[in-house]
Each structure stands twice: as structure tokens, then as C-alpha cells.
């Protein structure tokens, strides 16, 4: 094998070993693609608020009756009120 070919092959193999194993599409995908808007507060066990640079505000809820996780529409009135209360409470603590 030619020395140039061997050097090129070793460089290519080295860069393959250094790259992260996730495809670009998985790195930038938002967790919520669909939103539920007709979920009563009483059916929710807890909320998780996700905010990333690539996605708009994402609110993930775990349901009480089956433990399923769903994405809630952040424009729903009761969610807006909940977020406002949470932000006010956080501002008072600091």
C-alpha cells in the first residue's frame, strides 16, 4: 500500500472516531411536535417546562391516570396563568 494512501486512510479513520454518534436530525429535533389543548389541570400529575435554543417553549405533562407524557399547548389560558404565577414566585425569592 502506498504511504499516501495509508496516511489518508488513517486520517479518515481518526476523524470517524472523533465524531459524535448522533445524526444531526436527532440533535436539533424538538421534543414536542404536537400539542394537546383540551387537558384539564385535574388530570395532570406534574409539568416539565423545556426551553432550548432550537425550540419554542415546550411544556410536557405527565397524566395522573395512566402516567403518559403529553405536550401541552403553551398558549392555553390556564398554562399561561400557571407560568405567570411560577415566574412571579421565582422573582420574589431572588
UniProtKB/Swiss-Prot annotation:
Residues 29-33 are annotated as: Receptor and heparin binding. It comes from Xenopus laevis (African clawed frog). It is found in: Secreted. GO terms for molecular function: chemokine activity; growth factor activity; integrin binding. Belongs to the intercrine alpha (chemokine CxC) family. The keyword Cell membrane does not apply. Disulfide bonds join 30-55, 32-71. One of its GO terms (biological process) is immune response. The keyword Secreted applies. Monomer or homodimer; in equilibrium. Dimer formation is induced by non acidic pH and the presence of multivalent anions, and by binding to cxcr4 or heparin. The record marks 46 as: Important for dimer formation. Heparin binds at residues 41-51, 62, 69, 85. A motif (Receptor activation motif) lies at residues 22-23. The record marks 45, 48, 64 as: Important for integrin interaction and activation. Residues 1-21 form the signal peptide. Residues 48-50, 60-64 are annotated as: Receptor binding. Its main location: secreted. This is Stromal cell-derived factor 1. Chemoattractant. Activates the C-X-C chemokine receptor cxcr4 to induce a rapid and transient rise in the level of intracellular calcium ions, and chemotaxis. Signaling with cxcr4 mediates the directional movement of mesodermal cells during gastrulation. Binds to the allosteric site (site 2) of integrins and activates them in a cxcr4-independent manner. Pfam families: IL8 (PF00048).
